Amino acid sequence: MIRIIRVIRVKKKMTNRQIFLNHIGQTSPDPLALEIVRASGSKLYDVNGKEYIDLIGGVSVCNIGHGNKKVIDAIKKQAEDFMHVMVNGELVLTPQTAYAKLLTDHLPPSLNSVFFTASGTEATEGAMKLSKRFTARTQIAAFKNSYHGSTQGSLSILGDEYWRNAFRPLLPDILHLNYNSFNDLDSITKQTACVIAETIQAEAGVIVPEIKWMQALRKKCTETGTLLVLDEIQCGFGRNGTLWAFTQYGIVPDILLLGKALGGGMPLGAFIADKKIMDSFTENPVLGHINTFGGHPVCCAAGKAAMEFLLDEKIVETVFEKEELFLKNLSSSKIKKIRSRGLMFALEFGNFEENKKVIDLLI
């Protein structure tokens, strides 16, 4: 007689950390893997109740802190009314129109048409398409050490070959110039559809351009009929010390890129231009650019509430004062250099080992 023995394997329950490491797509071989369960104001709390001061802010997303009641109430109300109904640009949706009106009321008159996206990199992609469509040119100029997102088009203009090389071939006809270089502006010609620049280079380590260089860039673009696209996805919404960083340079871009803090903690991006430029998407072909979740009603409601709070509480007016406080207290022989603009900070250490020690101590 043959006996059949059934072997039952009992799976051991995985911890959240194990699920994170095994079932969430990773972006680095050694993630922080902190298990955050709550956030309030400028504080984060892990599963063990340990408190952290959040100096990252979701990478410039949470400009008014975590758990803002005005934002939460706006999200709840809009979720009760309706969430997703149609791609943006086809139906009249109050959350979109109300937020677009608030944004354009606080921008120069030529930045009057808002195309909402679901993220910052999508805003970059949209601006690249719009520039090519409006000018009927193909060349796009960007800057070395820049960062505009990691989708295919945004990656093509990203200013560091280390990040680009593994994903080639990328978009053709991309020109990379040196940031803050007057001589390189001569490379912008009547074949250039647009120049895309961060108003303040963030990922490069808070590189602040000279006022005269920014004005020369604006002048060169005007002379050649090239659209100037300024990326304020990270430095916008007051983090730089003013609501929009470009106002510190006495210039106005043809297209403005927004994201991160735009959604008040919810996923939202936008590119903003004059209506005569934006209307290039309406024909030849129609639906020249569409986006299923761009301008999601709940995200627009959250973003509008966050921007209103930012303005009503006059938070931006305190940014430079807070910058001085940080600069006064950031004192160590290990810090080789500090670069800042408003509440954007970059600290340079002598080597990676010193940098890692600081990170480990903070965690």
Regions of interest found by a model, annotated:
Residues 3-9:
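Short, low-complexity, charge-dense intrinsically disordered segments
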